[in-house]
Every structure is written in C-alpha cells, then in structure tokens.
C-alpha cells in the first residue's frame, strides 16, 4: 500500500512529477520514497546510507531517512507502513 503523504508536494515527487522546490533532489528523493514503500519493517530501512533516525522533541514518534545533508524524509511507522510522509528541509 502506498504511504499516506503529509503534503501534496511530497506525493508529487513520489509519483515522479516535477516540483520546482525539490528539483535539485527529486531523483534521489523519489528513490528514497520507493525504498520507504518497499519496506515491511523499520529494520528494512536500517541501511547505512539511509541513516534512519528516531526523532526527538516536537517530532517525537517520527523517524527520518536522509536524502542529503539538508533534506530528510520524515514519517511515522504505524502497523508496518509509513504514514504522514513528508520531505523536510532539515535546516529550517
């Protein structure tokens, strides 16, 4: 089942649609989103390059995987699937 997205921009990137805001990271972000969809457990996302992290503070209960130094894909893991998936500028 495809993940539930937190916003339209992330959903468009996942579908391969050009989003100007994410044009520099679109290809890599789409690949990461595909990996998120394919995962059946959080352990599947434990690859070193993804840098899976449990978040703290105002994002407690969420996880993130790295797109690059600036952007992350943040999501919640519920009943074996990613929900509230969003691409986030980590430095804003």
Q: Where are the predicted features?
A:
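Glycine-rich, flexible loop/turn motifs
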Residues: 1, 18, 41, 48-51, ...
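A generic secondary-structure signal marking the coil-to-beta-strand transition
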Residues: 1, 32, 51, 61-63
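Compact soluble domain cores
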Residues: 24-51
């Amino acid at each position: 089942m495809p993940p539930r997205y937190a916003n339209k921009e992330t959903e468009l990137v996942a579908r391969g649609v050009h989003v100007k805001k994410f044009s520099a990271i679109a290809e890599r972000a789409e690949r990461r989103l595909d990996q998120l969809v394919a995962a059946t457990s959080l352990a599947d996302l434990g690859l070193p390059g993804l840098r899976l992290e449990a978040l703290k503070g105002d994002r407690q209960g969420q996880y993130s995987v790295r797109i690059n130094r600036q952007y992350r894909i943040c999501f919640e893991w519920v009943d074996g699937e990613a929900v509230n998936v969003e691409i986030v500028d980590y430095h804003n």
